Amino acid sequence: MAEMKIADIRAMSPDQMDDAIVNLKKERFNLRFQRATGQLENTARLREARRDIARIKTIAAQQRAKTK
């Protein structure tokens, strides 16, 4: 999966954001194991997954603050 764009994340519903976070956490878990066993080819994907999670969480927090 490529880096997520801000506009794409803002278009997601809160449930879709939660699902995306769960999927990214699973992917990150698998990538960490691949790195530990020496099978990981694209090491930059670890950073992208971590940052995608942060992007989604940040936008979700902004949207929650806006609705209050």
UniProtKB/Swiss-Prot annotation:
An example molecular function term from Gene Ontology annotations: structural constituent of ribosome
InterPro entries assigned: Ribosomal_protein_uL29, Ribosomal_uL29, Ribosomal_uL29_CS, Ribosomal_uL29_sf
UniProt keyword terms in alphabetical order: Ribonucleoprotein, Ribosomal protein
Any Gene Ontology CC annotation: cytosolic large ribosomal subunit
Entry keyword Ribosomal protein: yes
GO BP terms: translation
Gene3D superfamilies: 1.10.287.310
Similarity section: Belongs to the universal ribosomal protein uL29 family.
Protein name: Large ribosomal subunit protein uL29
Lineage summary: Bacteria, Pseudomonadati, Pseudomonadota, Alphaproteobacteria, Hyphomicrobiales
Gene behind this protein: rpmC
